[in-house]
Amino acid sequence: MFEYLYGTVEYKKMDYIAIDINGVGYRVYFPLREYEKIEVGNKYKLYIYNHIKEDTYKLIGFLDERDRKIFELLLKINGIGSSLALAVLSNFSYNKIIEIISKNDYTTLRQVPKLGEKKAQIIILDLKGKLKNLTYTEEETVSMDMLEDLVLALEGLGYNKKEIDKTLEKIDLNKFSSLEDAIKGILKNMRIGD
């Protein structure tokens, strides 16, 4: 069993990456939400869930250990398999899931493909008690919301996704008090980088 893998991403497909560790390539499936964050040639530490079922063995990786914890909790719910649990984490971050559960927000949770009303209710009811010990970080939620708005604003100004992602990796969004301040700070940083 693997706790985590640390290595270089050799290539990536839509639902998995090949990570090289000392000349051995591991196929690791991951939430689609993290696709843009993972770049070929970079090193990453992936927290691994070892999915073993009858004749199948899959490594499922997460950039954040808290995402793996939520994934494991989802798998313990009757009727939720690895594909559906991965779909939930492909649509929502750790903090967003905590928020959805705490607010009983079935409507938002049902945005996950193939997740009907009944399963959404079961997930919320089942996780409500289990998530008491998991923390919700307000700062990170603000940053995620701001991040989405920033990307849209910068794309509107003509910057491409690769330029934007490269710049955002270097910046702590929590230091900005508003979206306007963040845009100014990022544009200044992008001009310096030119």
UniProtKB/Swiss-Prot annotation:
Residues 1-63 are annotated as: Domain I. One of its GO terms (cellular component) is cytoplasm. It is found in: Cytoplasm. It holds the Pfam family RuvA_N. Keywords: Cytoplasm, DNA damage, DNA recombination, DNA repair, DNA-binding. InterPro entries: DNA_helicase_Holl-junc_RuvA_I, NA-bd_OB-fold, RuvA, RuvA_2-like, RuvA_C, RuvA_C_sf. GO terms for biological process: DNA recombination; DNA repair; SOS response. It comes from the Bacteria. GO terms for molecular function: ATP binding; four-way junction DNA binding; four-way junction helicase activity. Its main location: cytoplasm. Residues 143-147 are annotated as: Flexible linker. Residues 147-194 are annotated as: Domain III. Has three domains with a flexible linker between the domains II and III and assumes an 'L' shape. Domain III is highly mobile and contacts RuvB. NCBIfam families: ruvA. Homotetramer. Forms an RuvA(8)-RuvB(12)-Holliday junction (HJ) complex. HJ DNA is sandwiched between 2 RuvA tetramers; dsDNA enters through RuvA and exits via RuvB. An RuvB hexamer assembles on each DNA strand where it exits the tetramer. Each RuvB hexamer is contacted by two RuvA subunits (via domain III) on 2 adjacent RuvB subunits; this complex drives branch migration. In the full resolvosome a probable DNA-RuvA(4)-RuvB(12)-RuvC(2) complex forms which resolves the HJ. The RuvA-RuvB-RuvC complex processes Holliday junction (HJ) DNA during genetic recombination and DNA repair, while the RuvA-RuvB complex plays an important role in the rescue of blocked DNA replication forks via replication fork reversal (RFR). RuvA specifically binds to HJ cruciform DNA, conferring on it an open structure. The RuvB hexamer acts as an ATP-dependent pump, pulling dsDNA into and through the RuvAB complex. HJ branch migration allows RuvC to scan DNA until it finds its consensus sequence, where it cleaves and resolves the cruciform DNA. Belongs to the RuvA family. This is Holliday junction branch migration complex subunit RuvA. It comes from Fusobacterium nucleatum subsp. nucleatum (strain ATCC 25586 / DSM 15643 / BCRC 10681 / CIP 101130 / JCM 8532 / KCTC 2640 / LMG 13131 / VPI 4355). The lineage of its organism: Bacteria, Fusobacteriati, Fusobacteriota, Fusobacteriia, Fusobacteriales.
